[in-house]
Amino acid sequence: MPQNRWKYPDGSVTIKLYEPFPAGESLLLKLEDKTMDYNKAALEMHETHKGKVGIVSKVEVATRDDLSTAYTPGVAEPCRKIKENPEDVYKYTFKGNMVAVVSNGTAVLGLGDIGPEAGLPVMEGKAVLFKEFGGVDAFPICIDAHDAASVIAACKAIAPTFGGINLEDIKSPECFEIEETLERELDIPVFHDDQHGTAIVVTAALINALRVVNKKMEDVHIVLNGPGAAGTAIIKMLMTAGAKDIIAVDQFGTLYKGCNSAEAHKNWLGEVTNPRQIKGGLKEALEGADVFIGVSKPGILTTELCKTMNKDAIVFAMANPTPEIMPDEAKAGGVRVMATGRSDFPNQVNNVLCFPGLFKGALSVRARDINNEMKLAAAYAIADLITDADRSEENIIPGAFDPRVAEAVANAVAKAARETGVARL
């Protein structure tokens, strides 16, 4: 076996990031060198290894006995056992630790609708992160399906093979129907990371930001700019966490009762948010606000707008690669706590803090679903890793490489699954 392919101590299938650097050196750490040309490095890495993932056998097939045990005739016996008791598929196959990363490539971050083939490198990367950060095996599946019904049918067809499904880079509003239908019709966890992974990490960061400024979730006035898939999930998650005063703002202005949006989810948001029924644009929404959360576009928030916010304002500007406002501009406007989606600024809101541990926890108890209680448990598990002594304006969330994160999230999610009755173990 080549040295850059190895088995994990637990013997699980290895989907491993191959290293084009000398043994023992981490590619991920090398890529943190700011002087490196990421585009050039990525092309070289992908071409050299023909992608980033592969399958490594858990067993050795070196003799006739090995062959007869791993394949015919011996393999017939586990097949018979599973036929007698379908739950034994978890006992005799990789299903219990295998996630499908499913995408149709219609909403790839920063690239848009690029199709399934062009989206494959991203899905390979997601599989790498599942394994590297959570020890969860994941397989990228890019499908040529654009309408919701076709994506749903494809996911249902492959579901018997997998312990969970991670939906990725599927455009709105189709993503809502796809996830809701699969959650209802499948008995394995289905999770759209672009929605809920973002929402969980944002909630974790906000929990700690509010601790820094000594405010409570139920008391603060929150403005969210960009109520698409991620923005809508963030609002739902914050409401689950206790937020009561949220205003959503899209390109046409605030959402309110009777706003008559062309998008159904925005009409729903207009009904359940904006308790004071504020009408207008971002300027009107931000007056006296405690928190701004942006999942929208670069430069939409200005220093002058920040000055209209409440004292000790919190700004999460998560448009990538250029945020809604740069940290120095926000600070000039009186913002006290600032977070972005970028690794070169403090307080990076990064989904990798969530999905590896969340699936690890859900799979460990064979959860049928990932419910709100499990999501909120994940958010608090992430937030609580920052102690009172360490918490500050520039340290409200763990770093992506914090080795404690996945295990803490997994334990919290598994506990919540058992407490809410969706665990089978």
Regions of interest found by a model, annotated:
Residues 140, 166-169, 190-193, 224, ...:
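General beta-strand structural signal in soluble alpha/beta enzymes
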Residues 3, 8, 14-32:
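Short, positively charged and aromatic/hydrophobic N-terminal segments
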Residues 109, 114-134, 186, 192, ...:
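Glycine-rich phosphate/diphosphate-binding loop of Rossmann-like nucleotide-binding domains
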Residues 10, 29-190, 410, 416, ...:
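N-terminal ligand-binding/catalytic initiation module
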Residues 90-95, 131-132, 157-159, 183-184, ...:
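Solvent-exposed alpha-helices and their adjacent loops that cap or buttress functional pockets
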Residues 193-194, 213, 317-425:
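Adenosine-phosphate binding glycine-rich loop
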Residues 267-336, 342-344:
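Rossmann-like adenosine-cofactor binding region
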